[in-house]
């Protein structure tokens, strides 16, 4: 199992898009992504400049998306 990498919000959003998610809308500094096959799933990614997404938030986003750390590394 791979440790969670340090990743910026922009890179995380691109990785989630490669996994099939799309940006539904942006509210302030938060991007809301949805998946066409799973309409009940809504993922919010904080995008505050070039800062990396904190590990706890990244772990929660991966859990919501149904991805593992290894899958995220492949999508980056």
Model-derived features with residue positions:
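Conserved functional hotspots at enzyme active or ligand-binding sites that engage polyanionic ligands
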Residues: 1-2, 44, 55
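N-terminal first-folded block
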Residues: 1-27, 32, 36-37
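Residues that cap or flank secondary-structure elements
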Residues: 4, 49-50
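Compositionally biased, low-complexity repeat tracts
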Residues: 24-25, 45, 52
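Short, charge-rich, low-complexity interaction segments located
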Residues: 31-45, 49
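C-terminal structural segments of small proteins and small subunits
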Residues: 50-76
